[in-house]
C-alpha cells in the first residue's frame, strides 16, 4: 500500500473516499463540519435521524454528498472527544482500513490524523496510522494449503495534515512508520514460524540474508566449535540435548560516518524451542514455546528497520540461537557450569535456560567496547504475573539508559515499565556450591533473573527488556506481536540525533 500526506480542504479532494470523524453523541469533528456546511447540512441531518451515534468503530458510508468532489464520504465513530486516547485512535484506524477494503475503495484521503489525541502531535498520529494499518493487514498463512481469499482493493492512503508546514513532519512519519512496520513484520514472521523449520540454523540463514540485502550490514555466524574455543560453556550446555546445533548470529550495521564510533549492542534470546529440558514444562501450551526466540526476532526486525532508515549509528545485533530439549546428553539440575566470564553457576532448574545463554553472550560482546548493551528476552513467567500482557519490563544498571528506554516506549506506544535491581535480590541467587544459582525462587522472579544477568554486564551500561508477557498472544488472536521493535527503533532514532521524533 502507498502512503502519502497532503494539506487541503476536504471539499476539494477528488478521491474515491474521504474519511472524517464523528464524536459521540452525534457531534461532527471540525473537518466533518466543513463538509456539512458545503452540503447544506446533509450530514448533520443524517445524524439527527439516528443513522450514526458516533460510538467508537461505528461506520457510515455516504455516496455523492452534495458539494463534495469525492465519490464517497466515510463517517467514522470516534467516541467521546475528550476520551480519545492512543489505543482507541489506533483501533479506529484499523477498523477504518478494514471498512475501506470492504467497500472496494482503491484510494482514500484520511482526515482522522487531524483528530486531537491528548499529548500527541501530527508526527505521532501519522506514524501510528501507518503502523496500525500495516499491523491490521498482517496475515501469516505460509503453511495453509488453501490460502484464504482476502479482499484488499485499497492501494493508496493519503493522510491530511492541518497545515503545509507539517507536510515534512508527515512525510518523515510515513518513512519511519514504514521502516518500523517492515521490522515488525520480519519479527512476526520469524516468531510465527514452526520450530521444526525455525531452528538456530534458520535464524542464522535469515541473518545472512539481511547482509545480502543491505550493504551497510555484515553478518558473522558462530557455531558450537568456535563457542567451545571461546569458553561459552553455559550457552553450549543449554543446547546439548538437541540435535540442532546452537548458533550465534552477529549482525553488524555500520551507519556512523565516524569509523571509531562505539556501537550500540542489542542481544536477543533465540530459544527456537524451549521444552524446559530435563525440568520439562507441562504439555498444555508447550507449542507456544516456539515464541521463546521472540527476543532474537525483535533484534532481527530492529536491524532490518534501521538499515532501511540508514540511521547514522553503529549497531550490533546478536541473535543467540539455541534449542532446549531433554535427552541423554542434556544438562541436568545439579550441574555446575563455568561461564565465559569464569564465574560458576549451579543449575537448579533447566527451564531457567535463557539466562544461561545470555550470560555468555553478554560476556562475548565486551570485545566491541559498546556504548551500551540492551538485551531482549522472553525470560520469565514472573514478568507476566507482575505486568501482564500489556507492558514490557525494563531493568538496568544505568539510570539514564533506563530512562531512555522508558521514554522511547512512551513515544512509540510500545510501553515498558522499570523494575528495580536492588542488592537485596542478589541474596536469592546464592549457592553453597558455585558462585551463584540460576534461579532465585518465586519471589521477584523477573528481578532475580535480571540480577543474574547483571553479574555479567559490569563492564558497560546495560539494560534488560523482559518481553515474556508482550511478545506474543494466545487464544483466537494467537501469534507474535512484533514487540518491542517499535520501542527499540524509537530508542535508536532518539540516539541518532536529527531524526528525533520530538524535534
UniProtKB/Swiss-Prot annotation:
Keyword annotations from UniProtKB, A to Z: Aminopeptidase, Cytoplasm, Hydrolase, Manganese, Metal-binding, Protease
Binding-site residues for Mn(2+) 1, renumbered to this chain: 274, 351, 353
Reaction it catalyzes: Release of an N-terminal amino acid, Xaa-|-Yaa-, in which Xaa is preferably Leu, but may be other amino acids including Pro although not Arg or Lys, and Yaa may be Pro. Amino acid amides and methyl esters are also readily hydrolyzed, but rates on arylamides are exceedingly low; Release of an N-terminal amino acid, preferentially leucine, but not glutamic or aspartic acids
Gene3D superfamilies associated with the record: Leucine Aminopeptidase, subunit E, domain 1, Zn peptidases
Location of the active site: 281, 355
Any one of the GO BP annotations: proteolysis
PROSITE patterns: CYTOSOL_AP (PS00631)
Binding residue positions for Mn(2+) 2: 269, 274, 292, 353
Cofactors required: Mn(2+)
GO cellular component: cytoplasm
GO molecular function: aminopeptidase activity; manganese ion binding; metalloaminopeptidase activity
Localization (cell): Cytoplasm
This enzyme's EC code(s): 3.4.11.1, 3.4.11.10
Cofactor note: Binds 2 manganese ions per subunit.
Family, as annotated: Belongs to the peptidase M17 family.
HAMAP family, A to Z: Cytosol_peptidase_M17 (MF_00181)
NCBIfam families for this protein: PRK00913.1-1 (NF002072), PRK00913.1-4 (NF002074)
Function: Presumably involved in the processing and regular turnover of intracellular proteins. Catalyzes the removal of unsubstituted N-terminal amino acids from various peptides.
Name of this chain's protein: Cytosol aminopeptidase
Amino acid at each position: 500500500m502507498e502512503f502519502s500526506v497532503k494539506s487541503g480542504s476536504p471539499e476539494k479532494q477528488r478521491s474515491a473516499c474521504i474519511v472524517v470523524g464523528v464524536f459521540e453523541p452525534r457531534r461532527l469533528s471540525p473537518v466533518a463540519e466543513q463538509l456539512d456546511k458545503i452540503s447544506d447540512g446533509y450530514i448533520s441531518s443524517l445524524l439527527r435521524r439516528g443513522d450514526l451515534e458516533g460510538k467508537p468503530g461505528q461506520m457510515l458510508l455516504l455516496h455523492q454528498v452534495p458539494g463534495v468532489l469525492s465519490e464517497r464520504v466515510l463517517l467514522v465513530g470516534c467516541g467521546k472527544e475528550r476520551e480519545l486516547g492512543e489505543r482507541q485512535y489506533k483501533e479506529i484506524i484499523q477498523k477504518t482500513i478494514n471498512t475501506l477494503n470492504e467497500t472496494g475503495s482503491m484510494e482514500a484521503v484520511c482526515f482522522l490524523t487531524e483528530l486531537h489525541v491528548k499529548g500527541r502531535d501530527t508526527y505521532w498520529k501519522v506514524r501510528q496510522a501507518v503502523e496500525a494499518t500495516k499491523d491490521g493487514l498482517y496475515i501469516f498463512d505460509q503453511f495453509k494449503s488453501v490460502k484464504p481469499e482476502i479482499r484488499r482493493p485499497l492501494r493508496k492512503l493519503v493522510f491530511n495534515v492541518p497545515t503545509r508546514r507539517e507536510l515534512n513532519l508527515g512525510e518523515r512519519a510515513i518513512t519511519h512508520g514504514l521502516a518500523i512496520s517492515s521490522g515488525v513484520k520480519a519479527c512476526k514472521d520469524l516468531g510465527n514460524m514452526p520450530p521444526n523449520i525455525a531452528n538456530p540454523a534458520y535464524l542464522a540463514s535469515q541473518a545472512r540474508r539481511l547482509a545480502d540485502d543491505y550493504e551497510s550490514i555484515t553478518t558473522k555466524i558462530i557455531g558450537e566449535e568456535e563457542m567451545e574455543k571461546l569458553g561459552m560453556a553455559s550457552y553450549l550446555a543449554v543446547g546439548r540435548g538437541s540435535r540442532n546445533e546452537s548458533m550465534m548470529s552477529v549482525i553488524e550495521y555500520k551507519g556512523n560516518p565516524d569509523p571509531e564510533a562505539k556501537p550500540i549492542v542489542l542481544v536477543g534470546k533465540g530459544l527456537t524451542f524451549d521444552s524446559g529440558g530435563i525440568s520439562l514444562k507441562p504439555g498444555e501450551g508447550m507449542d507456544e514455546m516456539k515464541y521463546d526466540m521472540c527476543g532474537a526476532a525483535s533484534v532481527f526486525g530492529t536491524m532490518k528497520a534501521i538499515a532501511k532508515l540508514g540511521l547514522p549509528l553503529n549497531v550490533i545485533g546478536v541473535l543467540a540461537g539455541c534449542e532446549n530439549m531433554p535427552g541423554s546428553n542434556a544438562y541436568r539440575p545439579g550441574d555446575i557450569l563455568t561461564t565465559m566470564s569464569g564465574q560458576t553457576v549451579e543449575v537448579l532448574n533447566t527451564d531457567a535456560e535463557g539466562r544461561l545463554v545470555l550470560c555468555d553472550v553478554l560476556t562475548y560482546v565486551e570485545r566491541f567496547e559498546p556504548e551500551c548493551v540492551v538485551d531482549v528476552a522472553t525470560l520469565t513467567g514472573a514478568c507476566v504475573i507482575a505486568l501482564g500482557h500489556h507492558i514490557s519490563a525494563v531493568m538496568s544498571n544505568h539510570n539514564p539508559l533506563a530512562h531512555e528506554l522508558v521514554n522511547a516506549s512512551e513515544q512509540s506506544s510500545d510501553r515498558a515499565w522499570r523494575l528495580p535491581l536492588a542488592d537485596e535480590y542478589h541474596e536469592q541467587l546464592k549457592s553453597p556450591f558455585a558462585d551463584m544459582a540460576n534461579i532465585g525462587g518465586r519471589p521477584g522472579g523477573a528481578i532475580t533473573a535480571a540480577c543474574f544477568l547483571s553479574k555479567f554486564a559490569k563492564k558497560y551500561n546495560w539494560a534488560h527488556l523482559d518481553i515474556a508477557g508482550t511478545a506474543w498472544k494466545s487464544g483466537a488472536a494467537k501469534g507474535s506481536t512484533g514487540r518491542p521493535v517499535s520501542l527499540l527503533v524509537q530508542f535508536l532514532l532518539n540516539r541518532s540525533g536529527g531524526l528525533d521524533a520530538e524535534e
